């Protein structure tokens, strides 16, 4: 069968955006697409739940409210910090930052409310851009 999974970011700890409301509306939109293409294309409803461990109650509400076919777990920032994309890595001890990042990833895995883990080396792409180094 031909199929597609439609997912979108939901960085649950976002300060400037109501991701709960967005997730509900996005799920409803995908459900309409599922119905429209039923019998022709398998459409899966998914979500990339970023930083789910930082707002577990909100995350659990989203996952309980919507019957996702696939949930991607990810960490785009450390708790109470900006996304790794925005950091000036010259101001950080990289080893310490990565240790904290992988500890957060470990907590995410222990939480386990997802089907697959996204981009495990996410900060490394931005560290490389700043420092020219790519090492673990």
State the predicted function of each range.
Residues 1-99, 103:
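A metal-dependent hydrolase metal-coordination microenvironment
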Residues 104-108:
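Internal active-site segments that recognize and position negatively charged phosphoryl groups
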Residues 114-136:
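Histidine/lysine/aspartate-rich catalytic loop segments that bind and position anionic ligands
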Residues 65, 111-114:
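Alpha-helix termination/capping residues and helix-transition junctions
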């Amino acid at each position: 069968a031909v199929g597609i999974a439609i997912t979108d970011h939901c960085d649950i700890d976002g300060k400037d955006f109501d991701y709960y409301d967005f997730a509900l509306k996005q799920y409803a939109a995908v459900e309409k697409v599922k119905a429209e293409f039923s019998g022709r294309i398998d459409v899966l409803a998914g979500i990339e739940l970023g930083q789910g461990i930082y707002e577990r109650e909100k995350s659990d509400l989203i996952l309980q409210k919507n019957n996702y076919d696939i949930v991607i777990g990810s960490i785009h920032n450390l708790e109470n910090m900006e996304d790794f994309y925005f950091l000036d890595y010259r101001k950080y001890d990289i080893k310490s930052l990565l240790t904290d990042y992988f500890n957060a990833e470990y907590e995410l895995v222990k939480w386990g409310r997802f089907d697959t883990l996204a981009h495990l080396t996410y900060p490394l792409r931005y560290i490389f851009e700043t420092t020219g180094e790519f090492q673990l």
